[in-house]
């Protein structure tokens, strides 16, 4: 009989006392539930002084806002904990620390990050963390290289692909990224004023062919252990520090997906800034987002290439020039997935505050239109791009009219 039961606040406190690795466990006395609680219960465990000491996170067996008609596997809690532990093995400085997890209870205890801030909120507020983009690039390089065929043996990699198979959560990604935005689906959510743009996307054969290719690669290319949901809301930042959280969508997939999702969230902020700040601050912020895009990719590519030269195990993959060739393929994937993120976050089920929190209705719509046009352009140009500088230059010069020619 399963030991699973939904935690109360009291359960969370008691669990943290047992497994929170604090020196004074009996000082843990209260639990505050945080987050939207639709997929998980997340508790901040506080001590007698009211200080948050650890986090207890438990997966729910269904989407709470819908009910038991939308069940979800509890195994995602194991996958999340093991993904974070694996990523922490190779990049501990940028991965939240997992203190304990129990697969049967679908629960995890992790370090408290109250001294950090959600990166999306900071980007919206105009607060700049100069090392964040470089640190994100480092995280992506370390985690994706060390879980790829460049580093793992074929036997270990195949076993890991099986262990991290995550069909239910991958199905969510497959639908929300690659299917729903391009059909009339009840999950889609957009301002009716945007219907002409939405219909144009649905009727664009070249775009839909490109999206089909991106989806096929997502379904079939088990290149590395992805975070699977690496947006600016799953990244915490502080002065000189960055930590990733929420890896329940982890699975072995195309490396460019994680990179593209991360870049897409920087560009969502880029699109929203004219509605979030005054003209001068918006212009400066947008220029910084483009620099951040360059920094993330350049840091990732340089570190991945250096790691490949130092640590590649397979003699064929160690052939001079192959890693550079492989990174070209990753870059083109990343640009396509970046465009997919822009579109699905604008008209699909799950939106972002970078656009939706804009108070002025007309400005919000203009920013949303920009995100849609930029997303479409990136998807179409992706097979033809060679470097990040060329793409950034085109976005800067003519942000709504990228054309699919070699950059």
UniProtKB/Swiss-Prot annotation:
Binding positions (ATP): 40, 57, 111-113, 246-248
Gene3D superfamilies: 3.90.1200.10, Phosphorylase Kinase, domain 1
The protein's Enzyme Commission number: 2.7.1.100
Binding site for substrate: 229, 344
Pathway noted in the entry: Amino-acid biosynthesis; L-methionine biosynthesis via salvage pathway; S-methyl-5-thio-alpha-D-ribose 1-phosphate from S-methyl-5'-thioadenosine (hydrolase route): step 2/2
This protein's record includes keyword Kinase: yes
Recorded GO MF terms: ATP binding; S-methyl-5-thioribose kinase activity
InterPro entries from the UniProt entry: Aminoglycoside_PTrfase, Kinase-like_dom_sf, Methylthioribose_kinase
Keyword annotations of the record: Amino-acid biosynthesis, ATP-binding, Kinase, Methionine biosynthesis, Nucleotide-binding, Transferase
GO biological process: L-methionine salvage from methylthioadenosine
Catalytic activity: 5-(methylsulfanyl)-D-ribose + ATP = 5-(methylsulfanyl)-alpha-D-ribose 1-phosphate + ADP + H(+)
HAMAP family linked: Salvage_MtnK (MF_01683)
Family membership: Belongs to the methylthioribose kinase family.
Protein name: Methylthioribose kinase
Record organism: Yersinia pseudotuberculosis serotype IB (strain PB1/+)
